């Protein structure tokens, strides 16, 4: 950049201010040790800065909340809103598709307690008009029954009626409050049939009595659900055309957005975002359950997940799969483990220099891993293998204790009851893992034998052959050895 070229300096300041907005700062500040020349001061003052050696500019935010489609996953979005509200982060614009349209209306209304209670109690029959069936305690049996009922009803009636959802919307939304909210604009997305054309609706500009229609149109996942008729036109789920409506927020003047993706079906719309548009993605690595079957227990888990993921995004907590107050102790344990491998067992760790090792670890961890974060990655992967749920804030020591006390040979009896209803994909993975349990038992016994017999050569072979899997087993062994109760046990392994 050349001094005096206004356009270049304007862009420079825009990018610097975008960086400050990314960290949600109130001001953008330049601090100089010595007074600036008149020419330099002119450049700063021309671009809105005040002062002489400390030049400040108050940042202006036009923040949007973008709520993607995702059906029964929607509780996650309310959890995100809880965290944002705690930090007094407000929005000028909300854009929502499908369940995002419904949640957008609840958020626009501003009644957190009502939104949370609604999702905590929500079941499939409060959304879809399915035939009554006898109460079933077994989650898997209930899943198959509800899915069969939904498929049969959709085929016979051309889509399951959403009359219960319509009643719930009308009972829980104050239409006058939505219509006359002076601070926040709500835009919903639906798909016009049969053209499959994207329709964006400014909720405050539509007729009051039509507000429920446009919210329901956005969430009508045709043909599984019946389409919505407004006037002479038919409308279906907005996710068919624009699953995550970031572009609408940009077009309506947003300069930054919190984007909440709840794993709705189908690809997201491809858009080109302005260089200085800031967006914070809030999505989870965990699956969120069935897309069309609503379950109160799963909703509560997803509420907690959304809250914790957003708190991590805001820098309050740490972790990738799980949430921690601090991750520093994980590094301490990992350094001790590496020392144990090299000094006590006398293993050689050349695989750490292999690109393939880091690629596999990153693929498993679903995030970047470097030597400094390897200990945390391994700890979280162990927690997953031992069925620890991600809906609480952990201390590293507490997590290690829970891992060491949990038997990997079997799933906890109450695990499904704590999670709630699973999706088809999750049920398949659950069944597959049950079949793998015997293999896990065999591995554990085998490595216990190698460690007890100090079979260094065989351990080295396994470590070079399958470094990630072997490290996880050895790390668990080491963590157990480090537990106070284990050190004091007279028959410790």
What are these regions (language model features)?
Residues 48-97, 105-493:
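Patatin-like phospholipase
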Residues 19, 28-29:
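Cysteine-centered motifs
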Residues 6, 18-20, 52-53:
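Ala/Thr-enriched low-complexity intrinsically disordered regions
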């Amino acid at each position: 950049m050349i001094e005096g070229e206004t356009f270049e300096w304007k862009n420079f300041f825009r990018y610097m201010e975008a960086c400050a907005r990314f960290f949600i700062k109130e001001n953008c500040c330049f601090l100089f040790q010595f007074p600036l020349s008149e020419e330099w001061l002119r450049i700063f003052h021309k671009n809105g800065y005040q002062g002489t050696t400390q030049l400040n500019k108050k940042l202006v935010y036009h923040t949007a909340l973008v709520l993607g489609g995702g059906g029964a996953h929607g509780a996650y979005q309310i959890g995100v809103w809880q965290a944002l509200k705690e930090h007094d982060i407000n929005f000028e614009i909300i854009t929502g598709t499908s369940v995002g349209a419904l949640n957008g209306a609840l958020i626009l209304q501003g009644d957190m307690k009502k939104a949370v209670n609604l999702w905590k109690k929500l079941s499939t029959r409060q959304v879809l008009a399915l035939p009554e069936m006898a109460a079933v305690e077994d989650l898997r049996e209930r899943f198959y029954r509800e899915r069969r009922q939904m498929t049969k009803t959709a085929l016979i009636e051309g889509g399951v009626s959403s009359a219960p959802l319509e009643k719930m919307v009308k009972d829980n939304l104050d239409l006058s409050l939505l219509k006359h909210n002076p601070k926040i604009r709500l835009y919903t997305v639906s798909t016009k049939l049969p053209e499959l054309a994207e329709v964006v609706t400014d909720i405050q500009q539509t007729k009051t009595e039509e507000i429920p229609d446009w919210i329901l149109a956005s969430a009508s996942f045709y043909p599984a659900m019946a389409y919505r008729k407004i006037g002479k036109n038919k409308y279906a789920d907005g996710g068919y055309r624009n699953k995550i409506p970031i572009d609408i927020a940009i077009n309506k003047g947003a300069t930054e957005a919190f984007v909440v993706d709840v794993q709705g079906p189908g690809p997201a719309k491809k858009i080109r975002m302005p260089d200085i548009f800031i967006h914070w993605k809030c999505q989870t690595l965990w699956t969120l359950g069935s897309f069309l079957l609503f379950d109160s227990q799963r909703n509560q888990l997803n509420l907690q997940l959304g809250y914790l993921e957003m708190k991590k995004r805001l820098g309050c907590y740490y972790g990738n799969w799980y949430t921690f107050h601090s991750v520093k102790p994980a590094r301490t344990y990992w350094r001790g483990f590496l020392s144990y491998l090299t000094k006590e067992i006398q293993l050689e760790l050349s695989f750490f220099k292999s690109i393939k090792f880091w690629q596999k670890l990153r693929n498993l961890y679903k995030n970047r891993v470097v030597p400094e974060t390897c200990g945390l990655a391994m700890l979280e992967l162990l927690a997953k293998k031992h069925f620890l749920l991600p809906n609480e804030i952990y201390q590293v020591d507490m997590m290690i204790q829970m891992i060491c006390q949990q038997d990997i040979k079997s799933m906890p009896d109450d695990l499904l009851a704590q999670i709630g209803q699973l999706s088809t994909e999750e049920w398949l993975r659950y069944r597959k893992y049950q079949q793998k349990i015997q293999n896990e038992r065999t591995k554990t016994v085998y490595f216990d034998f190698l460690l007890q017999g100090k079979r260094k050569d065989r351990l080295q072979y396994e470590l070079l052959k399958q470094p990630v899997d072997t490290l996880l087993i050895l790390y668990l062994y080491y963590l157990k050895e480090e537990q106070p109760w284990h050190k004091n046990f007279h028959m410790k392994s």
